[in-house]
């Protein structure tokens, strides 16, 4: 195997969107073109029992939302494609943000009736901060939506990124006729037996259709006043190519995939803690854990650490260093994924995502290296929780299952665990309420451990250096706790309690995280 040639073929990207913009549906269609699924049907088939391939967890199937990031792989047109389907729900932004550290590009799915929504904006900011290319898919043209020119204007005004339309819709909703493909200079037809037609046939096909006349006017305007196409600007994350289509009816998706693979970047390097970039073509293997997922197979209570390979080649059975612990590990049981189905893998290269079976060795953010290399990659973002719950086992006889469940779900980063410094009582912290619901559901369905959860409300979290700590600083308005790394932390009732503490202990420095 020519490793350099293999690395060049890799395209690794995440799909981001606001909930219900159609992200999981487009993922299904891409897998369909990659030959990974035979039936790319409607995603939210709650009554029919057909569920999205990427929404593999029980609660996702029940609720029709993605709450974990799925990893899927397929081959298309000489490229090896790695898709990371991320949760659209805002409570799971932590998982999504970490996933965005493991990709080289992002596909942003926008509901053409709603435009840029809150969660899309948040996720786009992370992508922009990383400087990776963004490709936009304006979805749901089979329904009535907003004017295409308005959608482009919104992209530029709200997200601050220049746009270039690769195609243009001819009507929408019931009047949707197809797409004027600017890049391939052809028409893509929504109705009838023929899929494509030449631009010359446009007038004959559509006659004096007012929508087609509008398209010609819009394109003339774009040619005069629109942005210029620039591959350099796309790769720098300064220009987003925009595709219109309908994921539900699988229209415009294949054209999008083919053009996307032409312009999406090869695997890029990753920054170490000293600021130096590790090149994907370095011969030595390196990678980092961006996600840990327990119970992908509930029958086996397994845990998988997802690793983005940054450089070199993985070979089954190889030994790696874990600089965080100073110990080594052997990578003998490694898989690649199509949502919940998986296959053992013997080789993988930079750009690939592999799943390493984990018995408690790894943590999110861990670096894996080989030989004399003991460097670490830049830390992944962590988030300070905003709302808290006290948690305990409902049945004292189930303490073992309760502790195992908490330990595994906390290591995934699904929720954060704190212990009351004085009483040892467990407290969970989360970014949003849905995280608690998912935690409770998974504890009961995957670990057979019913839990009692009591709300503590919102808290302002600050860390304190162990040498500055005096337990008498704690009060009912600022609970003293330990985080899961046993570091002391205060949970303040509100900002007033925090200011009161700062006035009382002016020499004590409190630390705030992201």
From Swiss-Prot:
It is found in: Cytoplasm. CDD domains: RF3, RF3_III. Belongs to the TRAFAC class translation factor GTPase superfamily. Classic translation factor GTPase family. PrfC subfamily. Increases the formation of ribosomal termination complexes and stimulates activities of RF-1 and RF-2. It binds guanine nucleotides and has strong preference for UGA stop codons. It may interact directly with the ribosome. The stimulation of RF-1 and RF-2 is significantly reduced by GTP and GDP, but not by GMP. Keywords: Cytoplasm, GTP-binding, Nucleotide-binding, Protein biosynthesis. GO terms for biological process: regulation of translational termination. GO terms for cellular component: cytosol. One of its GO terms (molecular function) is GTP binding. This is Peptide chain release factor 3. Pfam families: EF-G_D2 (PF22042), GTP_EFTU (PF00009), RF3_C (PF16658). Residues 8-268 form the tr-type G domain. Transmembrane segments: none annotated. GTP binds at residues 17-24, 85-89, 139-142.
């Amino acid at each position: 195997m020519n490793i350099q040639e293999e690395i060049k073929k890799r395209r690794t990207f995440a799909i981001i969107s606001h909930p219900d913009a159609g992200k999981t549906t487009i993922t299904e269609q891409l897998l369909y073109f990659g030959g990974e699924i035979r039936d790319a049907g409607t995603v939210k088939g709650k009554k029919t029992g057909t569920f999205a391939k990427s929404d593999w967890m029980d609660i996702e199937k029940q609720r029709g939302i993605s709450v974990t990031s799925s990893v899927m792989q397929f081959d298309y047109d000489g490229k090896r494609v790695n898709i990371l389907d991320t949760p659209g729900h805002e409570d799971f932004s932590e998982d999504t943000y970490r996933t965005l550290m493991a990709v080289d590009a992002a596909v942003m799915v926008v509901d053409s009736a709603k435009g840029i929504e809150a969660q899309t904006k948040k996720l786009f900011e992370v992508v922009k901060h990383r400087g990776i290319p963004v490709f936009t898919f304006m979805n749901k043209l089979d329904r009535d939506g907003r004017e295409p020119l308005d959608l482009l204007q919104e992209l530029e005004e709200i997200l601050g990124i220049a746009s270039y339309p690769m195609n243009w819709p001819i009507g929408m909703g019931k009047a949707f006729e197809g797409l004027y493909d600017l890049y391939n200079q052809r028409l893509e037809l929504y109705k009838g037996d023929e899929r494509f037609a030449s631009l010359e046939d446009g007038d004959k096909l559509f006659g004096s259709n007012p929508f087609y006349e509008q398209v010609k006017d819009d394109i003339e305007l774009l040619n005069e006043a629109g942005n210029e196409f620039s591959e350099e600007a796309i790769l720098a994350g300064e220009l987003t190519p925009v595709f219109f289509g309908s994921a539900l009816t699988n229209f415009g998706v294949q054209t999008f995939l083919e053009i996307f693979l032409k312009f999406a970047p090869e695997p890029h390097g990753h920054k170490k803690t000293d600021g130096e970039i590790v090149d994907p073509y370095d011969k030595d293997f390196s990678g980092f854990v961006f996600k840990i997922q327990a119970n992908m197979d509930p029958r086996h209570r397994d845990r998988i650490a997802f690793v983005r390979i940054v450089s070199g080649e993985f070979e089954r059975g190889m030994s790696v260093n874990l600089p965080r612990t100073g110990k080594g590990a052997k990578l003998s049981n490694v898989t690649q994924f199509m949502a919940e189905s998986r296959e053992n893998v013997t080789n993988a290269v930079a750009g690939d995502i592999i799943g390493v079976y984990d018995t408690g060795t790894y943590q999110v953010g861990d670096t894996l290296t080989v030989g004399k290399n003991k460097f670490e990659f830049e830390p992944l973002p962590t988030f300070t929780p905003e709302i808290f719950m006290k948690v305990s086992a409902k049945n004292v006889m189930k303490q073992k299952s309760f502790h195992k469940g908490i330990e595994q779900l906390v290591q995934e980063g699904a929720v954060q665990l704190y212990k009351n410094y004085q009483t040892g009582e467990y407290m969970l912290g989360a970014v949003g309420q849905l995280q608690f619901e998912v935690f409770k559901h998974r504890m009961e369905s995957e670990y057979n451990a019913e839990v009692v959860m009591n709300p503590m409300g919102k808290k302002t979290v600050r860390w304190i250096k162990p040498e500055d700590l005096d337990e008498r600083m704690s009060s009912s308005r600022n609970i003293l706790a330990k985080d899961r790394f046993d570091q002391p932390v205060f949970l303040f009732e509100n900002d007033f309690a925090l200011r009161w503490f700062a006035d009382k202990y002016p020499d004590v420095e409190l630390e705030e995280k992201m």
